């Protein structure tokens, strides 16, 4: 992975996986929760629809650096993004990223309890796994028969500046 290809790979993963664990630091320490990411790579922004009654606003007021973790266990891809966060009230943005499933929690994007969290990625760490599950199982079985170490390929960890 090189330069823009690195960032492109990060955005591809975020777009494909969608759900992440978002971690904030508040007055009572770290707090993580699953949220659905709404990435906008052209704006270098990951949007989240949140509830204004949650503790995220207070936590971001204490420390606006957040952590986002995306995992694809089947492909052995693990992505951690450090981002700067801000709470936003913008009905146009809420409407543009609104999905039908959001209606399970709110009465549309104009619901007064709908808030937006804007995450601007600063840097990302990507652990790109060596192989698919099938290859890993094959290599494990082969190593059990031959006694040799399994050939699982290269396990790469790369830190990418996202600014």
Name the predicted role of every residue range:
Residues 49-51, 71:
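Short His-Asn-centered micro-motif
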Residues 56-123:
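Short, structured beta-strand-loop surface elements
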Residues 42-47:
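Short active-site oxyanion
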Residues 112-163:
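C-terminal edge-of-domain segments
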Residues 30-34, 57:
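Positively charged, polar, low-complexity stretches
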Residues 1-21, 144-146, 156, 162-163:
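Extreme N-terminal tail/first-helix region
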Residues 36-39:
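A short, well-structured catalytic beta-strand-centered motif of the EAL phosphodiesterase domain
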Residues 12-27, 66-70:
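A short, Trp-centered hydrophobic/proline-enriched beta-strand micro-motif
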């Amino acid at each position: 992975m090189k330069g823009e290809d690195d960032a492109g790979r990060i955005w591809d993963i975020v777009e494909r996986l969608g759900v992440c664990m978002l971690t904030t630091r508040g007055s009572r320490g770290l707090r993580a929760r699953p949220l659905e990411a709404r990435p906008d790579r052209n704006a270098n922004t990951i949007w989240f629809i949140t509830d204004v009654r949650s503790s995220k606003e207070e936590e971001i007021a204490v420390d606006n650096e957040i952590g986002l973790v995306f995992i694809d266990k089947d492909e052995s891809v693990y992505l951690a993004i450090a981002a700067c966060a801000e709470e936003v009230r913008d009905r146009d943005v809420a409407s543009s990223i609104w999905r039908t499933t959001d209606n399970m929690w709110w009465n549309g994007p104009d619901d007064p309890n709908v808030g937006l969290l804007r995450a601007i990625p600063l840097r990302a760490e990507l652990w790109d796994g060596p192989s698919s599950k099938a290859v890993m199982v094959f290599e494990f079985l082969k190593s059990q028969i031959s006694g040799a170490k399994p050939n699982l390929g290269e396990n790469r960890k790369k830190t990418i500046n996202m600014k």
